[in-house]
Amino acid sequence: MHDLYEQGDTLASIFEAAAAAGTADHVVQFASTSKITHAGAGVAFLAASAKVLDALDKHLGVFSIGPDKVNQLRHVKFLNGRLSAHMADHAAIIRPKFELVEEIFSRELNGLGIATWTKPKGGYFVSLDVLPGLASRVIAMAKAVGLTLTPAGATFPKGDDPDDKNIRIAPTFGSLDEIHAAMDILTLCIKTASAEQVLGAR
């Protein structure tokens, strides 16, 4: 659904895997339209086995009379029959931003052996790995010159990246000019921190 290109990734079904393993009651999947319509005003939903849904229904019924049915209707009327076209419009806005990140990373970092990164076909993030022990340093260097990045370890449980190497890049919000400047700063910080580490080890 959140594809950047017409041919997105095909994701495996966790429910099919759980059912095949006899653990269907162990999976509860949450989703919302927050990145489809409007953050904070979307429709949330969950999927689970009938047994789990029955148990959740008993608990949730105590907390609320019911969901916001007007908002549900608003979403049905807006998205009915045009969800794919709506998401293609999203992709047209953010795809150039991801392509710019890829262009700058490839130009500035490719072949240096100091960073690797994903080239996603969908979603909202690029996962960047720098040399072990440098993510926090790179983020601090960037912040010192005015670029605020997602904290190191944000993609790990409890925010703890044992290798201190992963940085999550979220290029959807800024303009192309802002992203260009940010990636120029980031790649320079990566090169500088990497050089410091290599020279310090000699």
List where the protein language model places each region.
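Short, solvent-exposed loop/turn segments at secondary-structure junctions
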Residues: 1-3, 34-37, 50-53, 71, ...
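Conserved PLP phosphate-binding loop immediately N-terminal to the Schiff-base lysine helix
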Residues: 1-15
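Conserved core segment of the aminotransferase class I/II
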Residues: 19-95
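PLP-dependent enzyme catalytic core of the Aspartate aminotransferase-like
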Residues: 23, 144, 160-202
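Short, conserved active-site loop motifs that form the nucleotide-linked donor/cofactor pocket
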Residues: 27, 115, 147
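Short beta-strand segments
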Residues: 31, 45-47, 119, 125-129, ...
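Conserved C-terminal alpha-helix-loop-beta "cap" of PLP-dependent enzymes
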Residues: 57, 128-168, 176, 180-181
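Conserved glycine-rich beta-strand-loop-beta hairpin in the small C-terminal domain of fold type I
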Residues: 91-102, 114-129
